[in-house]
Design a protein with these regions (language model features):
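Detector for glycine-centered tight turns/loop "hinges" at secondary-structure junctions
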Residues: 20-21, 98-100, 144-145
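A short, compositionally biased
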Residues: 7-11, 83-87, 134
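Short linear motifs in intrinsically disordered
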Residues: 1-6, 75-82
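A generic structural signal for short beta-strands and their flanking turns/coil linkers
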Residues: 50, 61-65, 82-86, 103-105, ...
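Mixed-charge, glycine-accented linear interaction segment located at domain edges/termini
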Residues: 112-175
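Short, acidic/charged, Gly/Pro-enriched secondary-structure junctions
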Residues: 77-107
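Beta-strand elements of well-folded, non-transmembrane domains
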Residues: 69-73, 90-96, 111-115, 135-140
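Solvent-exposed edge beta-strands and adjacent loop segments
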Residues: 1-70, 110-121, 162-174
Length: 175
């Protein structure tokens, strides 16, 4: 058996607006659900013993974050902004000690809201709502360790410490 820490469950989530890169003190949404970005690469199909899809790992397809709020009011508060921070804590079991503790994660993302669900209102319901953000910037941290850093405006794509665009950027800059 390997000594891999177990990330058991998400214990709490808070979403903050971050206008001009400054995180607001109070969250806009608490105990909401955040679907973190999926990083997928565009592919080109070539013929090599049949068809074969080759991923262009220096580029990414559309990067989206979905925030499911517990009320329409929370979603409306988020709609006023283009930069966000989602913080969540996971209950973690340390493989070496067997002890449980919390691990903090932070997702910084900015872009344009693609869609906003109008929500559902019914007797006894919370009138929940969902917004989808198309991200031009996305950065995910586990504590202070950077897991993903994608910035379309700067041509940055770093995944688990590996700069996926460094060679391409050097060629484009003539270095």
């Amino acid at each position: 058996m390997s000594n891999i820490n177990r990330y058991v469950t998400v214990a709490g989530v808070a979403v903050y607006a971050a206008p001009d890169g400054i995180v607001q003190e109070q969250p806009c949404a608490v105990d909401s659900e955040v679907t973190l970005a999926t990083i997928s690469h565009p592919t080109t199909t070539i013929n090599m013993m049949g068809s074969y899809d080759v991923a262009d790992t220096a580029n990414v397809d559309n990067v989206q974050v979905t925030i499911s709020c517990q009320s329409v009011i929370e979603a409306m508060e988020l709609l006023k902004h283009e930069s966000f921070v989602a913080r969540f804590a996971m209950l973690t079991e340390d493989a070496s000690t067997g002890l449980s503790d919390y691990t903090g994660f932070t997702a910084y993302f900015s872009g344009h809201v693609q869609s906003s669900g109008g929500g559902t209102a019914g007797v006894g319901s919370a009138a929940d709502s969902t917004i989808v953000v198309n991200c031009s910037k996305y950065r995910l941290l586990q504590g202070s360790v950077e897991l993903i850093n994608m910035d379309r405006l700067r041509g940055t794509l770093v995944i688990m410490g590996v700069d996926k665009r460094s060679k391409l950027n050097k060629l484009l800059e003539g270095r």
